[in-house]
Amino acid sequence: MEEDRNWIVVPTWRVPGRMEKWHALVKYLKYRTKDLEEVRYVPHHKVGWAWWTCSRVIFPLQGKSHLEIQAYWNLTPEKGWLSSHAVRLTWYTEKFWTDVTPDCADILIHSTYFSCFTAGEVRRAIRGEKLLSCCNYPQAHKAQVPSLQYLALVVVQQNDRPQRKGTARKQWRRDHWRGLRVAREDHRSLKQGGSEPSAPRAHFPGVAKVLEILA
């Protein structure tokens, strides 16, 4: 008698292809800048009996909870099916787990990692003083209703950037994507095991942008 097959269906997000950019950025922020020093990185590996392979990045969060981002390869060996590459975003505690959206993942990560404006920045801005902190994860605020204080601090932060005859926007983009650029150049040196001085802290562009999530 043929055994019944039990299927487990989980929601995933389609991505266009391989995830080297994602892995390189995680390693850069974990080993170079130390922004993600507490994050556990499990490289690309085979999963027991399964035909597909995956990698895992586990973010310890506040309150003994975790966010896990799993990247999958070779999901659909039959040609013509859905994309062979996907990612799954899961938030879990000891007794509960649920899948989350990229926007929610950004908020969860920013709740523990990457600096943001401190409480005293509003008073400094009112007095016309230079801000002592900034938000290195602006994408995490996109899905939220921003407060007037946050919007005002963003404007002050943008006005504090040096203006260079129309190149301010280009300069901001270069700073915003600094982590990705350095990660592409740096993942080779990480493989060689060379030791270099710690790099300056980088902005995080957001989960959806780094993974290039399609749907």
Curated annotation (Swiss-Prot):
Multimerization, as annotated region: 154-167
Coiled-coil spans in chain: none
Name of a matching Pfam family: Vif
Membrane topology qualifier: Peripheral membrane protein
Motif (BC-box-like motif): 147-156
Protein name per Swiss-Prot or TrEMBL: Virion infectivity factor
Position of sequence motif HCCH motif: 110-141
Organism annotation: Human immunodeficiency virus type 2 subtype A (isolate BEN)
InterPro entries: Vif (IPR000475)
Post-translational modification, as annotated: Processed in virion by the viral protease.
Induction text: Expressed late during infection in a Rev-dependent manner.
Oligomeric form and interacting partners: Homomultimer; in vitro and presumably in vivo. Interacts with viral Pr55Gag precursor and human APOBEC3G. The interaction between Vif and APOBEC3G is species-specific, which may play a role in restricting the replication of HIV to humans. Forms an E3 ligase complex by interacting with human CUL5 and elongin BC complex (ELOB and ELOC).
Residues the record lists as Phosphoserine modifications: S147
Phosphothreonine, modified sites: T98
Protein family membership: Belongs to the primate lentivirus group Vif protein family.
Superkingdom as given in the UniProt entry: Viruses
Domain notes: The BC-like-box motif mediates the interaction with elongin BC complex. The HCCH motif (H-x(5)-C-x(18)-C-x(5)-H) mediates the interaction with CUL5.
Gene designation: vif
